[in-house]
Amino acid sequence: REYRDELENDSISVNYLELSSRNKAESYVDSLIKFLKKKKLSEINIFEIEDKSFEEEFLKALKDANVTVNIFKSPMFIFERGEFVSMAKGKKVYRMSSFYQKARKNLDILMDENGKPVGGKWSFDEDNRKKIPKNVEPPKMIVFKKSKYDEEIKKLIINNFDDHPGNLENIWFPVNRAGAEKQLDNFLKVRFENFGIYEDAMLEEKNFLFHSCISPFLNIGLLTPDKVIKKTLQYAEKNNVPMNSVEGFVRQIIGWREFIRGIYHEEGALQSKSNYWKHSKKLTSSWYDGTTGIDPLDDLSLIHI
């Protein structure tokens, strides 16, 4: 709803169907097709759909309804799907490090004039495993003003999704683009310098350390990776941010995030049906109720209950 308001404030006409106004027996795709028929539309433009099962359902339903679908590259990722295939071509196994190096070269990110990685090596990961000293206090998170739709949406969630995991008591994140950009800016100014050195650190009862906490915004499109990388590199150059922090952060976005997306689309169907480790037992209830005896795992389980 915040996004709808943003678009309308930019003088863009928006047709918005609220969940509360939809027939519960009607799927999202059903509602879309009904809308298209009402408006007498036979062609639509969409970005790539990342969820493979939903993509299949969506495209089949639109085809059956005789609606032409024009698909455009997703702005939520840097590379096209086909680029992952070409970058992995000739490899017997998928390796993130190989993909990451090609990505750096193709995008000319953190490369010197001789085509070599800035700093003399591709990864500074070995520098990013320090414990947080007792005298170092992680910065406090920004407290964002609640959306004007906050209470309304919470009631909607309780009424429709009460059996889903999680709770509504710890919503720390902003829900609009301005808030997402503010979160990124705060990370760059307050956390970025120490991101690298403490990247793998953990502190008991601390959910947020020196990480950016922008994954939710990248995953729903409030931030796009190309703009995040551009702003990050500009800030790093201007403020002499340590290379292990710069490279480590860049690697998460153009390396791991793009790599796992590529694996999902190329091998996801096979992986979902395979059992590489030959597991035969179910997880016990302790994994879900936070009683395994493994503190980090139990803490995480309790947070999500």
Locate the predicted segments by residue:
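Aromatic-anchored, charged helix-turn/loop surface patch used as a conserved interaction hotspot
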Residues: 251-298
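Short His-Asn-centered micro-motif
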Residues: 17-19, 46-49, 72, 220, ...
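Beta-rich, aromatic/charged-enriched effector core domains that present basic-aromatic interfaces
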Residues: 27-173
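Acidic-and-aromatic substrate-binding clefts and catalytic sites of carbohydrate-active enzymes
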Residues: 20-26
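Histidine-anchored nucleotide/phosphate-binding helix
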Residues: 1-6, 26-33, 232
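N-terminal beta-strand-loop-alpha-helix module at the start
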Residues: 1-19
